[in-house]
Protein backbone atom coordinates (compact mmCIF):
# COMPACT_ATOMS: atom_id res chain seq x y z
CA UNK A 1 0.00 0.00 0.00
CA UNK A 2 2.87 2.40 0.81
CA UNK A 3 6.66 2.53 0.99
CA UNK A 4 7.84 1.73 4.53
CA UNK A 5 11.26 2.77 5.87
CA UNK A 6 12.27 1.59 9.39
CA UNK A 7 12.13 4.59 11.69
CA UNK A 8 14.92 3.35 13.97
CA UNK A 9 17.45 3.44 11.11
CA UNK A 10 16.79 7.11 10.37
CA UNK A 11 18.05 10.22 12.05
CA UNK A 12 15.48 12.97 12.72
CA UNK A 13 16.91 14.93 9.79
CA UNK A 14 16.64 11.90 7.48
CA UNK A 15 13.05 11.34 8.59
CA UNK A 16 12.16 14.92 7.75
CA UNK A 17 13.89 14.63 4.38
CA UNK A 18 12.00 11.46 3.46
CA UNK A 19 8.65 12.74 4.72
CA UNK A 20 9.27 15.91 2.75
CA UNK A 21 9.01 13.83 -0.44
CA UNK A 22 5.32 13.33 0.35
CA UNK A 23 4.69 16.92 1.42
CA UNK A 24 3.71 19.90 -0.69
CA UNK A 25 2.33 23.40 -0.22
CA UNK A 26 -1.42 23.67 0.24
CA UNK A 27 -2.70 25.94 -2.56
CA UNK A 28 -5.91 26.64 -0.64
CA UNK A 29 -3.94 28.14 2.27
CA UNK A 30 -1.93 30.49 0.07
CA UNK A 31 -4.97 31.40 -2.01
CA UNK A 32 -6.86 32.43 1.12
CA UNK A 33 -3.83 34.25 2.49
CA UNK A 34 -3.33 36.25 -0.71
CA UNK A 35 -7.00 37.32 -0.58
CA UNK A 36 -6.69 38.32 3.11
CA UNK A 37 -9.19 35.66 4.13
CA UNK A 38 -9.08 33.48 7.22
CA UNK A 39 -6.70 30.52 7.01
CA UNK A 40 -8.16 28.85 10.09
CA UNK A 41 -8.41 25.11 9.53
CA UNK A 42 -6.28 25.31 6.37
CA UNK A 43 -2.83 23.73 6.88
CA UNK A 44 0.11 25.44 5.22
CA UNK A 45 1.43 22.07 4.02
CA UNK A 46 -0.29 18.86 2.92
CA UNK A 47 1.54 15.80 4.23
CA UNK A 48 0.69 12.39 2.76
CA UNK A 49 3.34 10.58 4.82
CA UNK A 50 2.56 8.67 8.01
CA UNK A 51 4.30 7.11 11.00
CA UNK A 52 3.07 3.51 11.28
CA UNK A 53 4.25 0.88 13.75
CA UNK A 54 7.86 2.05 13.80
CA UNK A 55 8.02 2.89 10.09
CA UNK A 56 8.00 6.09 8.07
CA UNK A 57 5.40 5.45 5.36
CA UNK A 58 5.17 7.46 2.14
CA UNK A 59 2.91 6.89 -0.91
CA UNK A 60 4.17 4.48 -3.57
CA UNK A 61 4.26 7.27 -6.15
CA UNK A 62 7.23 8.78 -4.29
CA UNK A 63 9.48 5.81 -5.11
CA UNK A 64 11.47 7.53 -7.88
CA UNK A 65 12.17 10.58 -5.70
CA UNK A 66 13.11 8.34 -2.76
CA UNK A 67 15.60 6.38 -4.87
CA UNK A 68 17.11 9.61 -6.16
CA UNK A 69 17.50 10.90 -2.59
CA UNK A 70 19.15 7.65 -1.52
CA UNK A 71 21.59 7.78 -4.45
CA UNK A 72 22.53 11.36 -3.63
CA UNK A 73 23.28 10.40 -0.02
CA UNK A 74 25.14 7.21 -0.96
CA UNK A 75 22.62 4.86 0.65
CA UNK A 76 21.83 1.44 -0.83
CA UNK A 77 18.19 0.38 -0.58
CA UNK A 78 16.95 -3.19 -0.13
CA UNK A 79 13.31 -3.90 -0.90
CA UNK A 80 10.96 -6.42 0.65
CA UNK A 81 8.02 -6.67 -1.75
CA UNK A 82 4.84 -7.51 0.17
CA UNK A 83 2.38 -6.36 -2.46
CA UNK A 84 -0.51 -8.59 -3.49
CA UNK A 85 0.47 -10.48 -6.65
CA UNK A 86 -0.86 -14.03 -6.19
CA UNK A 87 -4.11 -15.78 -7.20
CA UNK A 88 -3.58 -15.59 -10.94
CA UNK A 89 -6.86 -15.74 -12.89
CA UNK A 90 -7.40 -17.02 -16.43
CA UNK A 91 -8.71 -14.06 -18.44
CA UNK A 92 -8.82 -13.25 -22.13
CA UNK A 93 -9.58 -10.00 -23.89
CA UNK A 94 -12.35 -10.61 -26.43
CA UNK A 95 -12.08 -7.36 -28.35
CA UNK A 96 -9.48 -5.66 -30.51
CA UNK A 97 -7.93 -2.33 -29.61
CA UNK A 98 -7.48 0.38 -32.20
CA UNK A 99 -3.79 1.04 -33.03
CA UNK A 100 -3.68 4.22 -30.92
CA UNK A 101 -5.35 2.39 -28.00
CA UNK A 102 -2.87 -0.49 -28.28
CA UNK A 103 0.06 1.93 -28.06
CA UNK A 104 -1.40 3.50 -24.92
CA UNK A 105 -2.12 0.13 -23.28
CA UNK A 106 1.36 -1.24 -24.05
CA UNK A 107 2.93 1.89 -22.59
CA UNK A 108 0.98 1.50 -19.35
CA UNK A 109 1.90 -2.19 -19.04
CA UNK A 110 5.59 -1.27 -18.96
CA UNK A 111 5.02 0.14 -15.48
CA UNK A 112 3.40 -1.13 -12.30
CA UNK A 113 1.71 2.20 -11.62
CA UNK A 114 0.94 5.47 -13.34
CA UNK A 115 -1.71 7.67 -14.88
CA UNK A 116 -3.04 7.67 -18.43
CA UNK A 117 -4.56 10.94 -19.59
CA UNK A 118 -6.98 10.42 -22.46
CA UNK A 119 -9.80 12.64 -23.74
CA UNK A 120 -13.43 11.56 -23.62
CA UNK A 121 -14.24 9.18 -26.44
CA UNK A 122 -10.75 7.66 -26.64
CA UNK A 123 -11.87 4.44 -24.95
CA UNK A 124 -10.36 4.51 -21.45
CA UNK A 125 -12.79 1.83 -20.25
CA UNK A 126 -11.82 -0.56 -23.04
CA UNK A 127 -8.13 0.02 -22.31
CA UNK A 128 -8.86 -0.65 -18.64
CA UNK A 129 -10.46 -3.96 -19.62
CA UNK A 130 -7.36 -4.83 -21.65
CA UNK A 131 -5.09 -4.07 -18.67
CA UNK A 132 -7.20 -6.30 -16.41
CA UNK A 133 -7.12 -9.21 -18.87
CA UNK A 134 -3.39 -8.80 -19.58
CA UNK A 135 -2.32 -8.76 -15.92
CA UNK A 136 -4.72 -11.52 -14.84
CA UNK A 137 -4.85 -10.69 -11.13
CA UNK A 138 -7.94 -10.03 -8.98
CA UNK A 139 -8.91 -6.51 -9.97
CA UNK A 140 -10.78 -3.67 -8.33
CA UNK A 141 -12.05 -0.77 -10.44
CA UNK A 142 -12.71 2.32 -8.30
CA UNK A 143 -15.06 4.99 -9.66
CA UNK A 144 -16.33 8.29 -8.17
CA UNK A 145 -19.99 7.89 -9.16
CA UNK A 146 -22.41 4.98 -9.25
CA UNK A 147 -23.35 5.83 -12.85
CA UNK A 148 -19.86 4.75 -13.88
CA UNK A 149 -20.31 1.35 -12.22
CA UNK A 150 -22.95 0.42 -14.80
CA UNK A 151 -20.75 1.60 -17.68
CA UNK A 152 -17.74 -0.35 -16.48
CA UNK A 153 -19.75 -3.50 -15.80
CA UNK A 154 -21.28 -3.57 -19.27
CA UNK A 155 -17.90 -2.98 -20.92
CA UNK A 156 -16.06 -5.58 -18.84
CA UNK A 157 -18.75 -8.17 -19.52
CA UNK A 158 -18.44 -7.37 -23.20
CA UNK A 159 -14.64 -7.43 -23.50
CA UNK A 160 -13.33 -9.89 -20.88
CA UNK A 161 -13.83 -13.64 -20.70
CA UNK A 162 -13.05 -14.86 -17.15
CA UNK A 163 -12.55 -18.52 -16.21
CA UNK A 164 -14.28 -19.07 -12.88
CA UNK A 165 -12.48 -21.77 -10.86
CA UNK A 166 -14.08 -20.90 -7.54
CA UNK A 167 -15.79 -23.57 -5.50
CA UNK A 168 -19.57 -23.22 -5.87
CA UNK A 169 -21.56 -22.00 -2.90
CA UNK A 170 -23.62 -24.81 -1.39
CA UNK A 171 -26.77 -24.89 0.71
CA UNK A 172 -26.71 -26.28 4.29
CA UNK A 173 -27.87 -29.59 2.77
CA UNK A 174 -24.88 -29.71 0.43
CA UNK A 175 -26.66 -28.85 -2.79
CA UNK A 176 -25.29 -26.19 -5.11
CA UNK A 177 -27.02 -22.93 -4.28
CA UNK A 178 -28.90 -20.97 -6.91
CA UNK A 179 -27.27 -17.85 -5.50
CA UNK A 180 -23.69 -17.86 -6.72
CA UNK A 181 -21.35 -14.86 -6.46
CA UNK A 182 -21.13 -12.86 -9.69
CA UNK A 183 -18.17 -13.04 -12.05
CA UNK A 184 -17.98 -9.26 -12.08
CA UNK A 185 -19.05 -7.79 -8.77
CA UNK A 186 -20.54 -4.46 -7.78
CA UNK A 187 -19.96 -2.58 -4.54
CA UNK A 188 -21.99 0.60 -4.26
CA UNK A 189 -25.16 1.95 -5.79
CA UNK A 190 -27.25 -0.04 -3.32
CA UNK A 191 -25.47 -3.35 -4.01
CA UNK A 192 -22.77 -5.30 -2.21
CA UNK A 193 -22.22 -8.24 -4.57
CA UNK A 194 -18.51 -9.04 -4.19
CA UNK A 195 -16.90 -11.28 -6.79
CA UNK A 196 -13.27 -11.36 -5.69
CA UNK A 197 -12.28 -11.81 -9.35
CA UNK A 198 -13.15 -8.43 -10.83
CA UNK A 199 -15.12 -5.92 -8.78
CA UNK A 200 -16.29 -2.39 -9.49
CA UNK A 201 -16.86 -0.05 -6.57
CA UNK A 202 -17.53 3.58 -5.78
CA UNK A 203 -14.77 4.79 -3.49
CA UNK A 204 -17.36 6.02 -0.97
CA UNK A 205 -18.54 2.41 -0.49
CA UNK A 206 -15.04 1.16 0.34
CA UNK A 207 -14.60 3.14 3.54
CA UNK A 208 -16.49 3.73 6.76
CA UNK A 209 -15.95 4.69 10.38
CA UNK A 210 -14.66 2.72 13.32
CA UNK A 211 -17.57 1.93 15.61
CA UNK A 212 -15.59 2.76 18.74
CA UNK A 213 -13.23 5.59 17.81
CA UNK A 214 -15.14 7.13 14.92
CA UNK A 215 -11.94 7.20 12.89
CA UNK A 216 -12.25 6.57 9.13
CA UNK A 217 -11.35 3.01 8.14
CA UNK A 218 -11.12 1.02 4.91
CA UNK A 219 -13.00 -2.22 4.32
CA UNK A 220 -10.82 -5.33 4.45
CA UNK A 221 -11.78 -6.43 0.93
CA UNK A 222 -9.55 -3.65 -0.50
CA UNK A 223 -6.54 -5.75 0.52
CA UNK A 224 -7.58 -8.73 -1.65
CA UNK A 225 -6.71 -7.35 -5.08
CA UNK A 226 -3.52 -7.42 -7.12
CA UNK A 227 -4.65 -4.72 -9.55
CA UNK A 228 -6.46 -1.46 -8.88
CA UNK A 229 -7.72 0.84 -11.62
CA UNK A 230 -8.83 4.26 -10.41
CA UNK A 231 -11.17 5.76 -12.99
CA UNK A 232 -11.42 9.57 -13.06
CA UNK A 233 -8.36 9.51 -10.82
CA UNK A 234 -8.32 13.29 -10.39
CA UNK A 235 -10.63 12.49 -7.45
CA UNK A 236 -7.71 10.70 -5.73
CA UNK A 237 -7.03 13.75 -3.56
CA UNK A 238 -10.45 13.29 -1.93
CA UNK A 239 -9.85 12.09 1.66
CA UNK A 240 -11.92 8.89 1.28
CA UNK A 241 -10.19 7.81 -1.93
CA UNK A 242 -6.79 8.79 -0.57
CA UNK A 243 -7.40 6.50 2.41
CA UNK A 244 -8.43 3.62 0.13
CA UNK A 245 -5.37 3.94 -2.12
CA UNK A 246 -3.02 4.20 0.87
CA UNK A 247 -4.50 0.95 2.25
CA UNK A 248 -4.46 -1.16 -0.93
CA UNK A 249 -1.44 -3.52 -1.23
CA UNK A 250 -2.07 -4.24 -4.93
CA UNK A 251 1.04 -4.71 -7.06
CA UNK A 252 -0.45 -2.68 -9.91
CA UNK A 253 -2.19 0.68 -9.50
CA UNK A 254 -3.28 2.67 -12.55
CA UNK A 255 -5.18 5.92 -12.83
CA UNK A 256 -7.33 6.96 -15.80
CA UNK A 257 -8.55 10.50 -16.39
CA UNK A 258 -9.40 12.97 -19.13
CA UNK A 259 -8.36 15.84 -16.86
CA UNK A 260 -5.58 14.81 -14.42
CA UNK A 261 -5.10 18.47 -13.48
CA UNK A 262 -7.13 19.63 -10.46
CA UNK A 263 -8.56 23.12 -10.16
CA UNK A 264 -7.69 23.24 -6.44
CA UNK A 265 -3.97 22.69 -7.10
CA UNK A 266 -3.81 19.22 -5.52
CA UNK A 267 -2.49 17.59 -8.70
CA UNK A 268 0.70 16.49 -6.90
CA UNK A 269 -1.36 14.20 -4.69
CA UNK A 270 -2.53 12.25 -7.75
CA UNK A 271 0.97 11.27 -8.83
CA UNK A 272 1.89 10.31 -5.27
CA UNK A 273 -1.10 8.00 -4.91
CA UNK A 274 -1.48 6.61 -8.46
CA UNK A 275 2.00 7.12 -9.88
CA UNK A 276 3.36 9.62 -12.41
CA UNK A 277 1.77 10.53 -15.72
CA UNK A 278 2.82 7.69 -18.05
CA UNK A 279 0.90 8.39 -21.25
CA UNK A 280 -0.95 11.42 -22.62
CA UNK A 281 -3.20 11.33 -25.68
CA UNK A 282 -3.22 14.58 -27.65
CA UNK A 283 -6.84 15.73 -28.21
CA UNK A 284 -5.83 17.21 -31.59
CA UNK A 285 -4.59 13.83 -32.77
CA UNK A 286 -7.79 12.24 -31.51
CA UNK A 287 -9.84 14.70 -33.58
CA UNK A 288 -7.83 13.86 -36.71
CA UNK A 289 -8.18 10.11 -36.11
CA UNK A 290 -11.94 10.44 -35.59
CA UNK A 291 -12.37 12.57 -38.69
CA UNK A 292 -14.75 14.88 -36.82
CA UNK A 293 -14.42 18.63 -37.36
CA UNK A 294 -14.49 20.60 -34.09
CA UNK A 295 -15.95 24.11 -34.22
CA UNK A 296 -16.60 26.74 -31.55
CA UNK A 297 -19.01 29.59 -32.28
CA UNK A 298 -18.41 32.65 -30.07
CA UNK A 299 -21.76 34.36 -29.52
CA UNK A 300 -21.08 37.93 -28.42
CA UNK A 301 -24.14 38.76 -26.37
CA UNK A 302 -23.57 42.52 -26.36
CA UNK A 303 -25.55 42.78 -23.14
CA UNK A 304 -25.10 45.43 -20.47
CA UNK A 305 -25.83 44.72 -16.83
CA UNK A 306 -27.02 47.94 -15.15
CA UNK A 307 -26.91 46.29 -11.72
CA UNK A 308 -23.28 45.20 -12.16
CA UNK A 309 -20.76 46.88 -9.87
CA UNK A 310 -16.97 46.57 -10.28
CA UNK A 311 -15.63 44.12 -7.73
CA UNK A 312 -18.75 41.95 -7.74
CA UNK A 313 -18.17 38.26 -7.07
CA UNK A 314 -18.57 35.64 -9.76
CA UNK A 315 -21.76 34.33 -8.14
CA UNK A 316 -23.26 37.83 -8.13
CA UNK A 317 -22.41 38.24 -11.81
CA UNK A 318 -23.87 34.80 -12.53
CA UNK A 319 -27.15 35.83 -10.90
CA UNK A 320 -27.39 38.81 -13.27
CA UNK A 321 -26.52 36.76 -16.36
CA UNK A 322 -29.05 34.02 -15.61
CA UNK A 323 -31.81 36.61 -15.16
CA UNK A 324 -31.04 38.51 -18.39
CA UNK A 325 -34.00 37.96 -20.72
CA UNK A 326 -32.26 38.91 -23.99
CA UNK A 327 -29.31 36.62 -23.26
CA UNK A 328 -31.63 33.71 -22.47
CA UNK A 329 -33.60 34.33 -25.69
CA UNK A 330 -30.33 34.18 -27.67
CA UNK A 331 -29.45 30.81 -26.12
CA UNK A 332 -32.93 29.44 -26.80
CA UNK A 333 -32.91 30.67 -30.42
CA UNK A 334 -29.52 29.06 -31.06
CA UNK A 335 -30.68 25.76 -29.56
CA UNK A 336 -33.87 25.74 -31.63
CA UNK A 337 -31.99 26.57 -34.82
CA UNK A 338 -29.48 23.79 -34.19
CA UNK A 339 -32.28 21.27 -33.59
CA UNK A 340 -34.13 22.41 -36.72
CA UNK A 341 -30.92 21.83 -38.70
CA UNK A 342 -30.88 18.19 -37.62
CA UNK A 343 -28.38 18.56 -34.80
CA UNK A 344 -28.55 17.22 -31.23
CA UNK A 345 -28.11 20.12 -28.78
CA UNK A 346 -27.18 19.95 -25.11
CA UNK A 347 -27.62 23.14 -23.07
CA UNK A 348 -25.59 23.27 -19.85
CA UNK A 349 -25.97 25.78 -17.03
CA UNK A 350 -24.42 26.08 -13.58
CA UNK A 351 -27.74 27.08 -12.03
CA UNK A 352 -30.82 24.91 -11.58
CA UNK A 353 -33.19 27.89 -11.81
CA UNK A 354 -31.49 29.01 -15.02
CA UNK A 355 -31.86 25.55 -16.56
CA UNK A 356 -35.54 25.56 -15.61
CA UNK A 357 -36.03 29.00 -17.18
CA UNK A 358 -34.39 27.91 -20.45
CA UNK A 359 -36.54 24.77 -20.40
CA UNK A 360 -39.68 26.93 -19.99
CA UNK A 361 -38.67 29.27 -22.83
CA UNK A 362 -38.09 26.31 -25.14
CA UNK A 363 -41.52 24.89 -24.30
CA UNK A 364 -43.10 28.29 -24.93
CA UNK A 365 -41.57 28.21 -28.42
CA UNK A 366 -43.32 24.90 -29.19
CA UNK A 367 -40.39 22.53 -28.57
CA UNK A 368 -40.42 19.46 -26.32
CA UNK A 369 -37.11 19.75 -24.44
CA UNK A 370 -35.76 17.34 -21.84
CA UNK A 371 -34.84 18.73 -18.41
CA UNK A 372 -32.24 17.16 -16.11
CA UNK A 373 -31.56 18.79 -12.74
CA UNK A 374 -30.90 17.64 -9.20
CA UNK A 375 -34.45 18.58 -8.22
CA UNK A 376 -35.91 15.74 -10.27
CA UNK A 377 -36.65 12.58 -8.30
CA UNK A 378 -33.78 10.06 -8.58
CA UNK A 379 -36.04 7.34 -9.99
CA UNK A 380 -37.52 9.69 -12.58
CA UNK A 381 -34.07 11.05 -13.45
CA UNK A 382 -32.76 7.52 -14.02
CA UNK A 383 -35.71 6.78 -16.29
CA UNK A 384 -35.02 9.95 -18.30
CA UNK A 385 -31.32 9.11 -18.66
CA UNK A 386 -32.14 5.57 -19.80
CA UNK A 387 -34.59 6.91 -22.39
CA UNK A 388 -32.20 9.44 -23.97
CA UNK A 389 -30.74 7.03 -26.58
CA UNK A 390 -34.27 6.59 -27.97
CA UNK A 391 -34.53 10.29 -28.86
CA UNK A 392 -31.67 10.32 -31.39
CA UNK A 393 -33.95 10.86 -34.38
CA UNK A 394 -36.26 13.34 -32.62
CA UNK A 395 -33.54 16.02 -32.19
CA UNK A 396 -34.91 17.05 -28.81
CA UNK A 397 -32.96 19.65 -26.87
CA UNK A 398 -31.52 18.49 -23.54
CA UNK A 399 -31.25 21.15 -20.82
CA UNK A 400 -29.20 20.16 -17.77
CA UNK A 401 -27.07 21.45 -14.93
CA UNK A 402 -23.31 20.95 -15.15
CA UNK A 403 -23.12 19.23 -11.77
CA UNK A 404 -25.69 16.59 -12.73
CA UNK A 405 -23.97 15.61 -15.97
CA UNK A 406 -20.57 14.92 -14.47
CA UNK A 407 -18.44 11.85 -15.11
CA UNK A 408 -20.42 8.92 -16.42
CA UNK A 409 -22.76 10.70 -18.82
CA UNK A 410 -22.48 8.95 -22.17
CA UNK A 411 -24.67 9.94 -25.12
CA UNK A 412 -22.62 9.46 -28.25
CA UNK A 413 -25.01 11.13 -30.73
CA UNK A 414 -24.66 14.58 -29.10
CA UNK A 415 -23.00 16.99 -31.53
CA UNK A 416 -23.86 20.49 -30.25
CA UNK A 417 -23.09 22.04 -26.86
CA UNK A 418 -24.41 25.40 -25.67
CA UNK A 419 -22.46 26.68 -22.66
CA UNK A 420 -25.09 28.90 -21.05
CA UNK A 421 -22.97 30.05 -18.10
CA UNK A 422 -19.28 31.04 -18.30
CA UNK A 423 -16.44 28.77 -17.24
CA UNK A 424 -12.67 29.18 -17.33
CA UNK A 425 -10.96 26.17 -15.77
CA UNK A 426 -9.27 23.98 -18.35
CA UNK A 427 -10.56 20.76 -16.80
CA UNK A 428 -14.22 21.84 -16.82
CA UNK A 429 -14.05 22.94 -20.45
CA UNK A 430 -12.35 19.69 -21.45
CA UNK A 431 -14.98 17.65 -19.61
CA UNK A 432 -17.91 19.57 -21.08
CA UNK A 433 -16.53 19.51 -24.62
CA UNK A 434 -15.86 15.80 -24.17
CA UNK A 435 -19.62 15.22 -24.23
CA UNK A 436 -19.37 15.73 -28.01
CA UNK A 437 -16.20 13.77 -28.72
CA UNK A 438 -17.56 10.23 -28.64
CA UNK A 439 -17.62 8.61 -32.06
CA UNK A 440 -21.04 7.96 -33.57
CA UNK A 441 -22.24 6.87 -36.98
CA UNK A 442 -22.82 9.89 -39.20
CA UNK A 443 -21.14 12.38 -36.86
CA UNK A 444 -18.88 14.63 -38.95
CA UNK A 445 -18.88 17.94 -37.10
CA UNK A 446 -19.36 19.02 -33.49
CA UNK A 447 -20.11 22.59 -32.44
CA UNK A 448 -19.85 24.55 -29.20
CA UNK A 449 -21.83 27.76 -28.75
CA UNK A 450 -19.81 29.96 -26.39
CA UNK A 451 -21.70 32.97 -24.98
CA UNK A 452 -19.24 35.84 -24.50
CA UNK A 453 -20.10 38.79 -22.27
CA UNK A 454 -17.37 41.31 -23.04
CA UNK A 455 -18.90 44.11 -20.97
CA UNK A 456 -17.64 42.48 -17.76
CA UNK A 457 -13.82 42.25 -17.49
CA UNK A 458 -13.88 39.03 -15.45
CA UNK A 459 -15.99 37.26 -18.06
CA UNK A 460 -13.84 38.60 -20.89
CA UNK A 461 -10.75 37.11 -19.23
CA UNK A 462 -12.56 33.80 -18.77
CA UNK A 463 -13.30 33.76 -22.49
CA UNK A 464 -9.61 34.24 -23.29
CA UNK A 465 -8.78 31.24 -21.11
CA UNK A 466 -11.43 29.17 -22.87
CA UNK A 467 -9.95 30.01 -26.26
CA UNK A 468 -6.61 28.53 -25.19
CA UNK A 469 -8.34 25.33 -24.14
CA UNK A 470 -10.34 25.16 -27.37
CA UNK A 471 -7.07 25.45 -29.30
CA UNK A 472 -5.56 22.56 -27.31
CA UNK A 473 -8.64 20.45 -28.04
CA UNK A 474 -8.31 21.02 -31.79
CA UNK A 475 -11.23 23.41 -32.26
CA UNK A 476 -11.69 25.97 -35.01
CA UNK A 477 -13.49 29.18 -34.16
CA UNK A 478 -15.93 31.06 -36.36
CA UNK A 479 -19.14 33.02 -36.20
CA UNK A 480 -20.37 32.87 -39.80
CA UNK A 481 -23.45 30.76 -40.53
CA UNK A 482 -21.76 28.97 -43.43
CA UNK A 483 -19.67 26.09 -42.05
CA UNK A 484 -17.41 26.26 -45.10
CA UNK A 485 -15.88 29.43 -43.65
CA UNK A 486 -14.62 27.63 -40.57
CA UNK A 487 -11.25 26.81 -42.11
CA UNK A 488 -10.48 30.49 -42.57
CA UNK A 489 -11.01 31.21 -38.88
CA UNK A 490 -8.80 28.61 -37.27
CA UNK A 491 -7.32 29.26 -33.83
CA UNK A 492 -3.83 30.74 -34.26
CA UNK A 493 -0.88 30.24 -31.92
CA UNK A 494 1.79 32.80 -31.05
CA UNK A 495 4.35 31.53 -33.57
CA UNK A 496 2.58 32.86 -36.67
CA UNK A 497 -0.15 35.21 -35.48
CA UNK A 498 1.16 38.55 -36.83
CA UNK A 499 1.00 37.72 -40.54
CA UNK A 500 -2.51 36.27 -40.17
CA UNK A 501 -3.76 39.19 -38.06
CA UNK A 502 -2.49 41.76 -40.58
CA UNK A 503 -4.15 39.78 -43.37
CA UNK A 504 -7.48 39.71 -41.50
CA UNK A 505 -7.30 43.49 -40.92
CA UNK A 506 -6.55 44.20 -44.60
CA UNK A 507 -9.46 41.94 -45.68
CA UNK A 508 -11.98 43.60 -43.33
CA UNK A 509 -15.16 44.72 -45.08
CA UNK A 510 -17.21 46.40 -42.31
CA UNK A 511 -15.50 47.22 -39.02
CA UNK A 512 -12.59 46.47 -36.71
CA UNK A 513 -12.81 46.49 -32.92
CA UNK A 514 -9.62 46.28 -30.83
CA UNK A 515 -9.49 46.25 -27.02
CA UNK A 516 -6.22 45.96 -25.12
CA UNK A 517 -4.94 46.58 -21.57
CA UNK A 518 -2.27 48.97 -22.96
CA UNK A 519 -0.89 50.33 -26.25
CA UNK A 520 2.66 49.42 -27.30
CA UNK A 521 4.37 51.52 -29.97
CA UNK A 522 6.20 48.41 -31.21
CA UNK A 523 2.94 46.49 -31.69
CA UNK A 524 1.19 49.48 -33.28
CA UNK A 525 4.05 49.85 -35.75
CA UNK A 526 3.66 46.20 -36.82
CA UNK A 527 -0.06 46.77 -37.47
CA UNK A 528 0.34 50.29 -38.87
CA UNK A 529 0.21 49.51 -42.61
CA UNK A 530 -2.79 47.17 -42.41
CA UNK A 531 -4.79 49.50 -40.11
CA UNK A 532 -4.05 52.54 -42.30
CA UNK A 533 -5.04 50.60 -45.42
CA UNK A 534 -8.37 49.58 -43.88
CA UNK A 535 -9.11 53.10 -42.64
CA UNK A 536 -8.54 54.63 -46.10
CA UNK A 537 -11.11 52.16 -47.48
CA UNK A 538 -13.70 53.50 -45.05
CA UNK A 539 -13.57 50.62 -42.59
CA UNK A 540 -14.69 51.68 -39.10
CA UNK A 541 -11.95 51.22 -36.51
CA UNK A 542 -12.61 51.38 -32.76
CA UNK A 543 -9.70 50.99 -30.35
CA UNK A 544 -10.16 50.85 -26.57
CA UNK A 545 -7.24 50.64 -24.14
CA UNK A 546 -7.33 50.33 -20.36
CA UNK A 547 -4.44 52.72 -19.60
CA UNK A 548 -3.15 56.00 -20.98
CA UNK A 549 -0.59 55.32 -23.74
CA UNK A 550 3.00 56.51 -23.56
CA UNK A 551 4.17 59.35 -25.78
CA UNK A 552 5.75 57.03 -28.38
CA UNK A 553 2.46 55.11 -28.75
CA UNK A 554 0.52 58.40 -28.99
CA UNK A 555 2.84 59.44 -31.83
CA UNK A 556 2.04 56.26 -33.79
CA UNK A 557 -1.70 56.82 -33.29
CA UNK A 558 -1.32 60.40 -34.54
CA UNK A 559 0.71 59.28 -37.56
CA UNK A 560 -2.00 56.78 -38.53
CA UNK A 561 -4.77 59.29 -37.86
CA UNK A 562 -6.69 56.78 -35.77
CA UNK A 563 -8.53 57.79 -32.60
CA UNK A 564 -8.62 55.70 -29.45
CA UNK A 565 -10.47 55.81 -26.14
CA UNK A 566 -9.28 54.96 -22.65
CA UNK A 567 -11.47 52.94 -20.28
CA UNK A 568 -9.57 52.40 -17.06
CA UNK A 569 -12.12 49.97 -15.60
CA UNK A 570 -11.76 47.43 -18.42
CA UNK A 571 -8.95 44.91 -19.00
CA UNK A 572 -10.30 43.26 -22.14
CA UNK A 573 -7.81 41.95 -24.68
CA UNK A 574 -9.56 41.03 -27.93
CA UNK A 575 -9.93 41.92 -31.60
CA UNK A 576 -13.17 41.40 -33.50
CA UNK A 577 -13.19 41.91 -37.28
CA UNK A 578 -16.48 42.25 -39.19
CA UNK A 579 -18.22 40.82 -36.11
CA UNK A 580 -17.01 37.38 -37.20
CA UNK A 581 -13.26 36.87 -36.95
CA UNK A 582 -12.18 36.83 -33.30
CA UNK A 583 -8.72 37.32 -31.81
Please annotate each region the language model reported.
Residues 150, 184, 192-195, 346, ...:
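Conserved helicase ATPase core of P-loop NTP-dependent helicases/translocases
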Amino acid sequence: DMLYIPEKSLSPAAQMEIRGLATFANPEFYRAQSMHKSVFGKPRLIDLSELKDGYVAIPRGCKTQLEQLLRETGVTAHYSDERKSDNQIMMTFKGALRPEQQIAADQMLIYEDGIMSAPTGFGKTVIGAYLIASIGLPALVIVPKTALITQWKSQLERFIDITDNREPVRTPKGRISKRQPPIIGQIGGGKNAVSGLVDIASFQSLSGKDGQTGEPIVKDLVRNYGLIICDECHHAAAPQLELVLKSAPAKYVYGLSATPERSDGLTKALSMLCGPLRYVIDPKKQAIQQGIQRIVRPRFTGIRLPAYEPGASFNQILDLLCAHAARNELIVSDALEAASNGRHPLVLSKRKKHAEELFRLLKDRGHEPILLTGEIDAKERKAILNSLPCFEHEHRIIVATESLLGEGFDLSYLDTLLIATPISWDGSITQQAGRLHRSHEGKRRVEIFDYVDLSIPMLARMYQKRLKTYAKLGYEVYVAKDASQAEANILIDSSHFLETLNKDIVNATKNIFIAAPYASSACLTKLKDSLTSSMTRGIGIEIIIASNPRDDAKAVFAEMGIDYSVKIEGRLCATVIDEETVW
